Amino acid sequence: MRFINPKTDFAFKKIFGSDQSKAILISFLNALLYQERPVIVDLEIIDPYLAPKIQGMKDTFVDVRARLQDGRKVIIEMQVLNVEGFEKRVLYNAAKAYSTQLMVGESYKDLSAVVALTITDFVMFPEWPEAQSAYMLKEKERLTDYPEGDLELVFVELPKFRKELEELVGVKEKWLYFLQKAPDLEVIPETMGEIAEIRAAFQIANVASLSPEELEVQERKMMYIYDQRGVQSKARAEGRAEGRAEGRAEGRAEGRAEGRAEGRAEGRAEGRAEGRAEGRAEGRAEGQEEKAKEVARRLLGQMTDQQIAEISGLTVAQVAVLRAEK
C-alpha cells in the first residue's frame, strides 16, 4: 500500500475538502483548534474538491473552506514553499473572507467570525519552539481582547513537530504525523487506524484509489515542489562555493601586497604578519560579498528579493539596491 503526500494543495483538498470528507474535517479541526474537544459537530464544505477532467488543469486548489454550525467560517491552507509576502497573504485572505460576507443593505452585526488555519512545511516563527501558535486582536499595552474576536489566525509549523509513531499522544499529534509521514508508510499504523476519520483519510490518500488523471496532477505538484527546492539549494551551494574560492584568492593577493607595504614602514616582521592576517580577512569578506552580489544579480529575474537574500546571504535591502541598478 502506498499513500500520496497530503501536503500538496491538490492532495490536501482531496482529503479534507471532498464531499465525503465532512467527518474527516470535523475531527481535524476539533483536534487542531479546540484541543480535541467536540466543539464542531457539523459543518458545510464550501466549494468542495472536484476531480480533474482534463490534463493541464490550472492550480485551483488554494485551500479548504468550511462553514461551521454556528455560522463561523474556517479557511484552511497548506503551504509547502516559503514565498515572499506569505504572512501578508494569510492576513489578506482572512480579512477578505470576513469583509465579503455582507450583501448591500445587510447589517454589520450579521458578520460571522473567521478562523484562518495555516499549515506550513517550513518554519515561520523561529523565535517560538512550539509547532502551533494563534493570533487575535488585542489591546497593545494591557493585552486585553478586542470586544469582537471575529478574526483568528492559527499557524501550525510542521518542521517543529518531530515525534515518532510510538511517541504520539492524542488525535492532534496523529493528524500532524499523518501530514508529515503518510508518503513514507506502507500500511496504516494500528494506533492511527483506531481513529475512524484518520483511517478514512489514509484510504482517500491511497494511491490505488486515485484515477490516472489525479495521479498525474499529484505527480506534477510534487515535481514542481522538488524543482523549486532544487533551484534554491543549488543556487545557495554555488554562491557559497564561488564566494569562498574568490575570497581566498583575493585575500592572498591583498594580504601579500599590504603585508609588504606595512612591513617596510613598521618593520618587516610585524608588517608581514599583520598584513597577511588583515589582508586575508578583508579579502575574504570583500570577495565573498562581491560573489554574493554576482549570484544575486543572476537570480533577479527568477526570484523575489526575500528568496534571493536567503540564498546569497545578502540583506533584502542590498538585493533591492541591485534590482534598482539593473
Predicted features along the sequence, with ranges:
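Elongated, amphipathic alpha-helical interaction scaffolds
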Residues: M1-K326
